[in-house]
């Protein structure tokens, strides 16, 4: 699943590389009515393995993925892979997620582990990512090394857990919330190394508002965890 908003410079390359990387995967582009024509370009690439889901407006990362989960679940898919549309996640590494899928409900593509690599990212973004994961790990009592990674695989069973949960995040905090749900339902989680490359075209969707939402929600979950442990 590839959520998009104004990614016309990147989406064709991501789709073509994904199709070349694995014959096992189908591709779903979830477009939030991109004004730059991303959705129309994705439509032109539709075939038996490539699909496009159009949403009426920009609603955030979380709602876009939920729409994609619903689409895939209704069609009987067993595994769901999240991937950014900007080329930062390498389609050629999807095999690492797929290989780890048997016996696991959540496979986290991790930048900050042996074998992982981050290229062309400014120090500010590195610090935000590392601090965010560290803070969330302490607040939630988790030991994973990249809670905010957007390159991950989810099982159908975890998707069912997500559907029955009261999700409260819209932005990148959604990725932390998914790990929280998986842990709460005692789902089996594993990490695999990935290469992350800073986008070369288009604009990042990261904003101060998104960072604040993730921080506020993580802090709230941390307080709730402390209260429930008493």
Indicate where each model-derived feature is located.
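Catalytic donor-sugar/metal-binding loop of nucleotide-sugar-dependent glycosyltransferases
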Residues: 143, 166-170, 179-196
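A conserved acidic beta->alpha catalytic loop
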Residues: 31-40, 87
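Short beta-strand/loop segment that forms part of the nucleotide-sugar
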Residues: 24-34, 54, 83
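C-terminal catalytic/acceptor-binding lobe
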Residues: 186-230
